[in-house]
Amino acid sequence: MGLSDGEWQLVLNVWGKVEADLAGHGQEVLIRLFKNHPETLEKFDKFKNLKSEDEMKGSDDLKKHGNTVLSALGGILKKKGQHEAELKPLAQSHATKHKIPVKYLEFISEAIIQVLQSKHPGDFGADAQGAMSKALELFRNDMAAKYKELGFQG
């Protein structure tokens, strides 16, 4: 299920655009996640009180967390599948502390794809979308395997 060198290049090319505004992209990804899947909001004590999109857009904490999420994901993507060291602490915290189900990782992957489609249509055509989808699936599968090792049935 690995990606070719060309596919990784497509992923990292569009990711360069994301890194120009990690916090802004991250905020949009989280807002889209919470709008499309309101049940995910319950996992975030800090954001549970944010009921409207305007409240979410005005939240510095949401923007900071979006930056954290996409910064971590970028570090993983740049490893081109060789992300064991980066993944282990992330899986540990998401399985044992935050109890984030794998399904929610699918939901945020969808939100990432949607935000990239809307913000970077010229750099995120069908090939880049396919490559990013594969990269995010690889990430999710590896997270799920780590969850299993940790005894978390998320």
Curated annotation (Swiss-Prot):
Name recorded for this polypeptide: Myoglobin
GO CC aspect terms: extracellular exosome; sarcoplasm
UniProt GO MF annotations: heme binding; metal ion binding; nitrite reductase activity; oxygen binding; oxygen carrier activity; peroxidase activity
Domain Globin: residue ranges: 2-148
Keyword hit for Cell division: no
Annotated keywords: Cytoplasm, Heme, Iron, Metal-binding, Muscle protein, Oxidoreductase, Oxygen transport, Phosphoprotein, Transport
Main location: cytoplasm
Positions that bind O2: 65
Species per Swiss-Prot/TrEMBL record: Ochotona princeps (Southern American pika)
